[in-house]
């Protein structure tokens, strides 16, 4: 399939529009979570809504901006708090509040929207998660955020309607 340069640019703009729509919806969902619900870990779940929120922020920073090596927008300890394989039961030290995470999520979206659309065509230094280009990685990042959005929605419903283990 041959795509014109103009068509490619429009497709790239669409990716950034998806980030905007997805992030705004993510923020709307976490705004609807009460303070009492954010650190509850329902039966059958390894993490909390608080963790999922920080995880989305941290992994998006990692994939879109090279965190922790290429960006200093987030504290370095976010990898220990919210990186893959982490859990709230292991948290020690300074853990950001949900309010802080919400501000950082909004800031991150603004920075994502500043990425030049043509950058999505750039090849990655080495394939990551099956992705060869930055645009492919952006697509996986969008899917990742949507997956965790679903987890948060499920957890909220369970917390509201069923027993919890905390």
Predicted regions and their residues:
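Short, Lys/Arg-enriched N-terminal segments with co-localized hydrophobic residues
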Residues: 1-10
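Conserved catalytic core of Hanks-type protein kinase domains
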Residues: 32, 52-55, 115
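Short, contiguous alpha-helical
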Residues: 16-20, 27, 37-84, 126-166
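Extended low-complexity intrinsically disordered regions
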Residues: 3, 83-87
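Short Lys/Arg-rich basic patches
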Residues: 11-15
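Acidic/histidine-rich alpha-helical segments that form the ligand environment
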Residues: 86-125, 136-141
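Amphipathic alpha-helical packing segments from all-alpha helical-bundle domains
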Residues: 24-29, 108
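A structural signal for long alpha-helical coiled-coils and helix-turn connectors
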Residues: 34, 64, 113-116, 120, ...
